[in-house]
């Protein structure tokens, strides 16, 4: 299969490769260092061809099962985190040993959703990853499951890999798992499931039924599709391919499903506002303000706000909601929640001089469609 979108992945200089738990485990769920070594070989070939590669690797919990004497993947949070703390050591050591065969050094980068959402930590993570690549080390990124809580069900690093792809300015994202690509329904349950080789936008997914989780990891097809759409919307093409065909996927992108990138890449700040930042509050708007913000791309003024919720400070990201509570945009708010509560519904001329700035400036505001809202 050839297409301009596959060619973009085949020729990408900067690449993020996400390796799912099922790509690193046996059918019984035990960590398999041999499978990891095979994936490292495929990545090495791509790097020898001139690409810079960052790896987002799942598998820490699976790698901790055997050393802790467990018979299966744990279900409770405390044991998952204990397994992750032990397994992360085994996981990064396995990557280190695999790349040592090629004379390469690896660096471990553990992140949480909170790290990505906070602007300072976000920037520090970006600098660390950029510096590792400049020093020709292979960055191995994983979610820090040991301290994560709800994020431990983040989607088996699918969403994290999409965020990292934009963070490092990657030219493409490759998601490797135990699946051939995208089908209109689960091919393991439906014999006549139709394979979808290319997705040009969310409209191509109408009628597609995606499973929510795998039995070994936490990321099912729904998680992978959401991550692929997120990255593609940010301007990064995505290939969803089977880990068994990793060599082919990384060599010429002729397998799996490709998700086409939007023509114009989102700026780092607008991407952070739309997808990465954690919203600490919400502003409910009247219908006129919704039109001004979404259709006319104008700044939000206090007069168009009908309600304020949450605790936030000036500089935080908040959700902007329509009268029916649907999120229509996200933006950087200029005032603390306590200040804003006194401004609701008031025209600019009624406010004191120090409170006449827009509540959310147009430059710090990103409209969000209904489908994008599900990816946030």
Swiss-Prot record:
Domain PUA span(s) in chain numbering: 280-358
InterPro entries per record: AceGlu_kinase-like_sf, Asp/Glu/Uridylate_kinase, G5K_ProB, Glu/AcGlu_kinase, Glu_5kinase, Glu_5kinase/COase_Synthase, Glutamate_5-kinase_CS, PUA
Enzyme Commission number(s) from the entry: 2.7.2.11
Binding site for substrate: 58, 145, 157
Subcellular location(s) of the protein: Cytoplasm
GO cellular component annotations of the record: cytosol
Keyword tags: Amino-acid biosynthesis, ATP-binding, Cytoplasm, Kinase, Nucleotide-binding, Proline biosynthesis, Transferase
Reactions accelerated catalytically: L-glutamate + ATP = L-glutamyl 5-phosphate + ADP
Pathway in which this enzyme or protein is active: Amino-acid biosynthesis; L-proline biosynthesis; L-glutamate 5-semialdehyde from L-glutamate: step 1/2
Keyword Translocase tagged: no
Residues that hold ATP according to the record: 18, 177-178, 218-224
Example GO molecular function: RNA binding
Entry similarity comment: Belongs to the glutamate 5-kinase family.
Alphabetical GO biological process terms: L-proline biosynthetic process; proline biosynthetic process
Keyword Ion transport: no
Protein name: Glutamate 5-kinase
Note: Was identified as a high-confidence drug target.
Gene3D superfamilies: Acetylglutamate kinase-like (3.40.1160.10), PUA domain (2.30.130.10)
